[in-house]
Structures are given as structure tokens and as C-alpha cells.
Amino acid sequence: DCPELQAVLDEYHKPVVIQDQVLGELTLDKDYDTFEGEIQWCGKDVSLSLEVNAESKPSWTRARSAAKKLLADCETWDKAMRELAAKNLTELANNWLSQDEENPRDPETDPITEEELTRRISLTSLSVTSGGSFTAWFDCDEMFTDHAVTVYGSLKKGLKTANIEG
């Protein structure tokens, strides 16, 4: 045993927790260089992950600031993300529906519409980088079996793309 090394290891394993007035309690996951927490996004509980450099406190501040900017305008961002997902993925949702033998719904006579897709997806998780880029994961209410809808964007450039992943 090496007491000096053990002291360093003990210090490393101490939890790093930030109490933020807007974002709540954020806990650093040193293995993944992320702060994890829960936020209220448009009235719903959503997991928040801030991608940071664990050794650089300025990156913590930048990631928190970016997340707060998104949260402050969540209604606008939420609407835009849902609309982009609907625009990009409604046709694909109907293709999946046509191949789902267990679902009695016929996409020829009763297709999923953009409005329906917009309504049925719900944000479950948001990841924000210190540079202001973000990824939003949406539950897709079984429209894409057990996959998720992901929307990518940044504060500077707006929304980039929406995909199905998982």
C-alpha cells in the first residue's frame, strides 16, 4: 500500500457537486467528463448532461451558461425541435408503420401526420457542450419501435438535423 497514492485516489473519488440556481444539483461523472442532473423543460422532468473538461472549471461555466440559455427559451427550442423532427421523419415513420405487422394501422389510409409526430414525441434527455452545441433525445411513443428521435443543434447556428437512433 502507498498512502500518498491512496490519498490522491481518495481525492479523485470525492463527488464533485454544483448547486446551480437554475439547473439544480449537478454531479460530475469523472469517467465521462459530464455533469449530470435533472431539469424542468417546459414543465417536464428531463435528464441534463453537460459535456465538460473535468480539469477545466471554465468549461463547466460555459456548459452551464449554454444550458441556461436553452432552458430560458425552452418553449421556442422545443417547438422548433419537434417541427424539425416531424419535417425530417414523418415519411420514415410511415415507412416503419407499413412494415410493422403487429400494428393494425394502415399508413395508406391513416398515415402519421407531421402534426401527430410533433405531438407524440417528448423530450427525455438533453446534452449540452461547453461550446454551446446540444443533442436532444425524444421518446417517440413507439413510432420507431424502441428507437429514439435525436435532434442536433447549437446556440450559434440553430438546429442542424433530426435522426432516429438507438
Enumerate the language-model features and the residues they cover.
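Acidic, proline/glycine-rich low-complexity IDRs
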Residues: 1-28, 32-36, 111-166
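Contiguous hydrophobic, core-forming segments of folded domains
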Residues: 2-77
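Generic detector of ordered, mature protein regions
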Residues: 48, 61-63, 84, 90, ...
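Long, charge-rich alpha-helical interaction segments
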Residues: 52, 57-113, 117
